[in-house]
Design a protein with these regions (language model features):
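A structured beta-alpha segment of the ubiquitous adenosine-cofactor-binding alpha/beta core
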Residues: 1-51
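A contiguous active-site-proximal alpha/beta segment in oxidoreductase catalytic domains
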Residues: 3, 29, 82, 111, ...
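Rossmann-fold NAD(P)-binding glycine/threonine-rich loop
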Residues: 36, 40-94
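Hydrophobic/aromatic beta-strand patches that form the interior of the parallel beta-sheet core
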Residues: 7, 57-59, 137
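Residues at the C-termini of beta-strands that transition into short coil/loop
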Residues: 10, 62, 143
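Acidic, glycine-rich segments within the central catalytic cores of soluble metabolic enzymes
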Residues: 85-180
């Protein structure tokens, strides 16, 4: 956060919305992480802001995706790290005991989606530089955590296996573990 300048804006007031619109008119990127539909309900949807600035890259982290880019029965649900870890499946493969879900130490449900969103933002900014056209970019926290479980998804999809907690072991590599 070096050299970062922060402001607080009340988005529920017309004055606050006017400030956002004025900032967006000059901005390259807007990042938000409200539930799907929140900014739309405030009159600050991607579509309305893109009218003010066609080069705008509007980036959103959602718990379970955005209706603009796909459908999810959970799209309206709020989410945070531990919810993303549980729904994404990583808690089911972490720790030593089956039946006792364990969250991963770091907040991967928050940080991994943010890193993936950064990649999307960089690509969209590059596109805007070349074409003058902004984009809506979103990352679902659920999808990002599920991507961390890629081997488990393949095991289930192709072999019908339901992977469980592995502790310090690895089901495919040997020797593998903690040795003193």
């Amino acid at each position: 956060n070096r050299n970062k300048k922060s402001i607080s804006i009340d988005l529920k007031t017309e004055a606050g919305k006017a400030i956002v619109r004025r900032l967006v008119a000059e901005a390259d990127v807007l990042v938000e992480n409200f539930r799907a539909g929140t900014m739309d309900g405030l009159g600050l949807s991607y579509e309305s802001l893109a009218e003010l600035n066609p080069r705008l890259v509007y980036a959103a982290v959602r718990g379970f995706g955005d209706p603009r880019t796909g459908t999810s029965p959970y799209a309206e649900w709020p989410a945070f790290d531990v919810v993303a870890q549980a729904m994404g499946g990583i808690m089911g493969i972490t720790g030593p005991d089956r039946g006792q879900p364990l969250k991963v130490g770091p907040g991967v449900g928050d940080t991994v989606p943010a890193m993936l969103l950064t990649v999307g933002i960089l690509a969209a900014v590059r596109h805007a530089e070349r074409t003058g056209e902004g984009q809506f970019v979103d990352v679902a926290m659920y999808d990002a955590v599920l991507a961390l479980c890629e081997r488990m998804v393949h095991q289930h999809s192709y072999a019908g296996e339901v992977p469980g907690p592995e502790g310090n072991a690895h089901p495919l590599l040997c020797p593998f573990g903690m040795f003193a």
